[in-house]
Amino acid sequence: MPEKVAKGIMCTGQVILDSPKEFVIDFLQGLTRPYQVVSRVVLTPQTVNELAEAMQQNLDMYTKNYGPPPPVPGPVPDRRPTIQEIYENFRLPEELLSGSYANSVLIGHSPTEFFMDFITGFYPTSAVAARIFLPVQQIPRFLNAINSSLKQHQMRYQRRNEPNGENPGTG
């Protein structure tokens, strides 16, 4: 594993984008200026579904061992910023424009952090494409965002692929 990937990246926020064939998760760092996208991971819808399941399992194990994650402190913003506003404030380095493709994910946790290894499983050797660390307080919100994005993706794109907008086998 390249040293750059092995060290991992701590992130303070996430943005999930989707298209018919893939999801893009941008991991943000907003502690120091310039605010920036610190990692971009490209996943298939199936891999995002597996990510949601694995994250839920890890959150359940975390809750069993340590109790529920503490809530993120601070005021709730009056409104969510638009995608355009986010990317006006967070610099996207040129080397991250294409992102890192992954077709599996490994998740683990400690009492204070979760980690995600996004893995590219190609012959002859699988490799970690990105390693992300998240504070435990962010996990419930991130999991909700993933699940919400999956539902929106299904409503937006899967109906288009079905003949006459009907579910297969119902007509």
Where are the language model's segments positioned?
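Positively charged, low-complexity terminal tracts
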Residues: 1-171
